[in-house]
Amino acid sequence: MKTQMIRSLTFQDGNAEVAMNFYVELFEDSRVLKVSRWPEGGPVEKGKIMQATFELNGNLFMCSDSPPAHEWDFTPAVSNYIECDNMTEVKRLFSRLSEDGTVTMPLNDYGFSSCFGWVIIK
């Protein structure tokens, strides 16, 4: 069995490159691995991301500028969970992810965790 059998794939509605670069710059040991772009005459603007794979601190993710308009969007029912080694890193990441986002649970002790926060990013 592969080390990471399940990967996140997000459809970004034209913002895949911005989102991918934001994450790669935010997390240490991260990089873009592969980018395939839509050609001229494709279902979306030429150069938009058909499919991209990137690595965030050893974990693989994928994104796409999906061409059809979907009735669905991101949902908090499926979320990415970040674990940090120290409070400095927790605060740095939470602060950056909260910029222009919606904090649904500020960093706090909620009983099930001494330091937990939940943010819906931009």
Feature map (PLM): residue ranges:
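Core segments of cupin and vicinal oxygen chelate
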Residues: L9-G58
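Short glycine/proline-enriched turns and hinge-like loops at secondary-structure junctions
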Residues: K46-G47, D73-T75
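Vicinal oxygen chelate
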Residues: K2-M5, L9-F11, L33, E55, ...
